[in-house]
């Protein structure tokens, strides 16, 4: 039976107003997943059974909560996945998963769209999984501000606040660990939230434990857009219209009329297509095959020749890589990504390294395209987080899996296992297949037989860890 739970609190409106307003979070039960259902779902997604265990039944709620946006307070929605069967004083870690590009409001996680189903698989491992829908998606009827860093971050942070506030009503406790992941647009959103949990007061309430974004456009101004417009065509022209219209709904400076950006007949059709009821395929099919036919002829020259062009200023405002991590940060990418260029991760890695960071890595998952990369990045991030979660046994926290330390990582020819000795047994497992491809004993693993990509290494008594092989 659908259950509606409401909690009313009073809080300061953080954007625009300094007065107080009554804030309300609601949680409506949408579905319950049994362990057997989740195990079958994992098989359907191709997750190796020897690397995944459905440990808990899961309840999924649609949470509606307030957040600041453009000087006002708006209601947004998200999916909350609660693992069942814990007894006090066990506490759960928060895992915020940020979803990728969606055009239809009802494809959002709280409506259990395909990406939303991942939440149950993550939660069954013993994590409280939060999946914000974002402004303009889910139940929100506003225009979605596509890849707008501040609203993405706020959607995540204020859902964390809502989940904390609802804990008593829904019967769970939190253990103080806070993890982030996300793919594609979700990689950008996870990076934005990781930045704000590190560099703003958001982290005073929710200290970041680790983040593992995948294939996100972290450097929009210097990498993603220049590389997009340097080509004759782009794989998903609908994204360009989504971005321009979404950002203009925030800044109001990119255009007065859409025909200043796009040629006809496309300028007259894009607003109707981006009304939250059409999917990506429909919108892409309505776009021309080349950028030359889509974008106004002189616009790109104006943008590239004027650093202060409103489009450049908006892009810079939504770059999300110029900050120093204080918790582990793993940035997954694939080298054949045709949608989000992998150089975004390399630019972020280079900038952070130059600024003295030692907490970050850019992980090459191999020569895969955007779609092929998704499952590996999302599952890899889930394994990485699981190895850092404090599981609760008999009321006492302990790590569910010990995280194996390996150096170097990424590696090309050889990796050293920290704490190993000449007799330590180890094995290398394919993350996609779950099959053991190498085994042996010792302090080092020779990698010549492994193709570039992500591999799981298990060492007896030392735990397991994800290794990136790059050449």
Where are each of the predicted segments found?
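Residue-level detector of functionally pivotal "anchor" positions at catalytic/ligand-binding pockets or at interdomain
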Residues: 390-407, 413, 435
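Catalytic-loop region of hydrolases
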Residues: 23-87
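C-terminal catalytic histidine-bearing segment of alpha/beta-hydrolase fold enzymes
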Residues: 307, 312-313, 339, 346-347, ...
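C-terminal tail/sorting-segment detector
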Residues: 437, 452-471
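Accessory cap/linker subdomain of secreted extracellular hydrolases
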Residues: 214-322
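Short beta-strand/loop motif that positions the catalytic acidic residue
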Residues: 330-337
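Short, surface-exposed "cap/lid" segments of acyl-processing enzymes
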Residues: 70-75, 83-121
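Alpha/beta-hydrolase active-site loop
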Residues: 146-168
């Amino acid at each position: 039976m659908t259950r509606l739970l409401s909690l009313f609190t009073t809080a300061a409106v953080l954007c625009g107003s300094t007065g107080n307003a009554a804030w309300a979070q609601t949680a409506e039960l949408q579905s319950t997943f049994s362990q057997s259902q989740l195990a079958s779902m994992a098989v359907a997604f191709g997750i190796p059974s020897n690397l995944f265990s459905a440990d808990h039944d899961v309840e999924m709620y649609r949470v509606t909560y307030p957040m600041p946006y453009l000087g006002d307070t708006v209601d947004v929605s998200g999916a909350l996945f609660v693992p069942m069967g814990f007894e006090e004083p066990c506490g759960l870690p928060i895992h915020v998963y940020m979803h990728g590009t969606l055009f239809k409001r009802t494809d959002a996680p709280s409506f259990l769209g395909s990406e939303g189903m991942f939440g149950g698989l993550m939660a069954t491992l013993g994590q409280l999984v939060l999946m914000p829908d974002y402004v303009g998606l889910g139940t929100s009827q506003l225009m979605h501000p596509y890849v707008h860093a501040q609203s993405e971050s706020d959607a995540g942070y204020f859902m964390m606040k809502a989940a904390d506030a609802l804990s008593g009503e829904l019967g769970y406790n939190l253990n103080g660990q806070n993890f982030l992941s996300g793919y594609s647009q979700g990689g950008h959103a996870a990076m934005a939230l990781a930045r704000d949990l590190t560099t703003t007061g958001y982290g005073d309430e929710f200290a970041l434990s680790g983040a593992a974004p995948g294939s996100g456009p972290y450097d929009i101004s210097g990498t993603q857009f220049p590389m997009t417009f340097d080509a004759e065509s782009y794989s998903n022209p609908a994204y360009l219209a989504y971005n321009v219209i979404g950002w203009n709904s925030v800044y109001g400076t990119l255009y007065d009329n859409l025909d200043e950006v796009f040629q006809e007949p496309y300028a007259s059709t894009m607003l109707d297509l981006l009304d939250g009821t059409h999917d990506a395929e429909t919108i892409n099919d309505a776009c021309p095959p080349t950028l030359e036919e889509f974008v106004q002829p002189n616009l790109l020259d104006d943008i590239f020749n004027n650093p202060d062009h409103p489009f450049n200023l908006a892009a810079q405002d939504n770059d999300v890589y110029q900050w120093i991590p204080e918790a582990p940060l793993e940035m997954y990418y694939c080298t054949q990504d045709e949608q989000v260029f992998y150089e975004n991760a390399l630019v972020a890695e280079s900038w952070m390294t130059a600024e003295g960071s030692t907490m970050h890595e850019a992980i090459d998952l191999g020569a895969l395209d955007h779609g092929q990369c998704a499952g590996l990045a999302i599952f890899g991030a889930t394994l990485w987080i699981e190895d850092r979660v404090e599981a609760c046994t008999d009321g006492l926290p302990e790590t569910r899996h010990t995280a194996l330390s390996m150096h170097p990582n990424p590696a090309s020819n050889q990796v050293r296992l920290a704490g190993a000795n000449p007799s330590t047994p180890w094995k290398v497992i394919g993350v996609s297949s779950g099959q053991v491809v190498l085994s042996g004993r010792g302090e080092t693993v020779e990698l010549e037989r492994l193709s570039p990509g992500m591999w799981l290494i298990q060492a007896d008594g030392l735990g397991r860890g994800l290794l990136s092989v790059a050449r």
